[in-house]
């Protein structure tokens, strides 16, 4: 074993998650809504996938980072007004990292949530990213493209 490494079973991992001992989690997603909701599983009749431990992680971890491609294979946006897949958790996402952008979810209050475009991938402009995002992004603090 490498120093600092730990091995544990799923029972212990859920105890750590549910006990609030995890500071940050990184989850994949099918969709993220403008309100920071995450959908990362689907109904089996609509495709593969099922519920796993993501609900526990999303609900019991203070910082939730989502990593995903920005669009589907059909070029549909994955950052959307409202998730069309079953929700994993509501209002939990803090940061979205896609193949073209890094977007911070800013929770001013429950009625005032913004998606701040923090960074674009090389060769992408803020306008390019906005065109493939289904909701409005804010650009303050972003260098002009």
Predicted feature residues:
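Conserved phosphate- and dinucleotide-binding cores of soluble alpha/beta proteins
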Residues: 1-145
